[in-house]
């Protein structure tokens, strides 16, 4: 894993405006880690609810999976239709913006694909680029022409669209030259979209009928390069790819900080069990950095999760010596989990942490607190989630 010390550039020195550094979510002395490399052109990072990162390699027509436990990368979905942006629908299926197939598609859990949106008023879309899913299931996406040449264009404009759960495709705006990155404010009352080559970020008010209105210039970046993927955190800060790395803005349009990245940033997203890690796709590599912030609108499917929490049976079971314990939360919850032997003695503390809604995984290697391998036998995994307790029996065979 290659590490680059971040260069926290006071942007006020570059553009003549003051920077409110006190609000920066970037810890002093933080580092950006290169966690995967050697691809062709990466995009669309997405933290999967099963506890791993997926991302697109557009020219390779492949979605890759990065395992945080091992640091290894493997193929998640291929061919991907030259996918770019990725997201999740309400059921936890992966949504893909496919340049090659000129559509938004859905990948089911069995790996099969189905079209979500591919034509508007009988004409093919250009090449859907990025998307975000509202908590009610509506899919908002941008449709610039980056995946096609001008002779293939049928729409003759580059739109921002909404696809409803009922199957209706609605054009929201066609005023931008190259609409690209797209995301909501934490309360979903505002929609941010950037105009890539113009380096401008715009914001609209989301209306009760899900149209967008009151278009306003949020910020105009300077420097070489382009604007691309964007996300917000729970405090309403906006994170946008831009010249030199990731630009961080306060909700009132002030530049707070900039995360320097050694390659051209294409997109970014939140992940890890607490959603305080920002994953960044850039050039041929994927980077990550821990921040003093929590990602907003982590995934729409959390609204459909069971109330409280669910503890799954460990897998594999019986096991030797590695096993995985998965649990699902419907809301942010303080979790204490530990492993006990048959005499009721605690042998290992798995976690004592606050987790966001979603599916999470913990690993146990059949060792005690001192790292000593335990004897074969029956063990119990006990989870405490506020006022709820769940226990699962585990069988360890050496």
Feature annotation, model-predicted:
Residues 23-39, 215:
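A short helix->beta-strand "capping" segment at the edge of beta-propeller domains
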Residues 31, 37-52, 79-103, 121-141, ...:
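Beta-rich, blade/repeat-based domains predominating
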Residues 58-59, 99-100, 146-157, 196-197:
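Short, solvent-exposed loop/turn segments at conserved positions within beta-propeller repeat blades
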Residues 199-200, 204-206, 212-215, 219-251:
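Loop/turn-rich, solvent-exposed surfaces of beta-rich toroidal or solenoidal domains
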Residues 301-315, 319-340, 349-352, 361-364:
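Glycine-centered coil/turn sites that cap beta-strands in beta-rich domains
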Residues 353-357, 363, 372-398:
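C-terminal tail/sorting-segment detector
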